[in-house]
Regions:
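Short, well-structured N-terminal submotif of metal-dependent ribonuclease cores
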Residues: 1-37, 52-59, 135
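Acidic, PIN/NYN-like endoribonuclease modules and their adjacent C-terminal/linker elements
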Residues: 3, 102-136
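Acidic active-site catalytic centers that drive phospho-/nucleotidyl reactions
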Residues: 7-9, 44, 97, 116
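Short acidic alpha-helix initiation/capping motifs at coil-to-helix transition points
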Residues: 39-42
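Active-site-proximal, substrate-binding regions of enzyme catalytic domains
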Residues: 44-72
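Active-site neighborhoods of divalent-metal-dependent phosphate/nucleic-acid chemistry enzymes
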Residues: 72-115
């Protein structure tokens, strides 16, 4: 299977107790596949865990280390950021969603798993957005 990119919401479901079925699917994507995330995703995950999930810094650090052992964590370049600005303008994405999309494209990921973006949307004829929680 090809590498795939995970949006922040996938990691959030894996570490929250709110929806067990989504947590199971998220954990499978994180720990059983060939996933990539960016430092941006780690930063967003950290912020949500601290502010919304009310986890303490030690638990968040443990989660980040666990994730980083299972998933390739990458940075992004200025070129990626500039491409994100174009994507944001051309597709009406928020800048931060466009940055995740741009990073996935730069790393030749054919799939971006996200609950927050349009399911089955294709970007630049190379990247499909897939909501892993769509059943049936």
């Amino acid at each position: 299977m090809s590498k795939y990119f995970l949006d922040t919401n996938i990691l959030i479901y894996a570490y929250s107790n709110s929806e067990p079925l989504k947590a199971d699917k998220a954990n499978a994507l994180i720990f059983e596949g060939d996933a990539i995330i960016s430092l941006q995703v780690i930063n967003e995950f950290t912020n949500v865990c601290l502010k919304k999930l009310k986890l303490n810094a030690t638990d968040v650090s443990t989660a980040i280390l666990e994730i980083s052992r299972a998933i390739e964590v990458i940075g992004f370049s200025l070129k990626t950021q500039l491409h994100a600005l174009q994507l944001s303008q051309n597709h009406s994405f928020s800048f931060y969603d466009a940055l995740i999309i741009s990073t996935a494209l730069e790393n030749n990921c054919p799939i971006l798993y996200s609950e927050d973006l349009q399911h089955n949307q294709q970007i630049d004829h190379r990247l499909f957005i897939v909501n892993p929680f769509v059943y049936g």
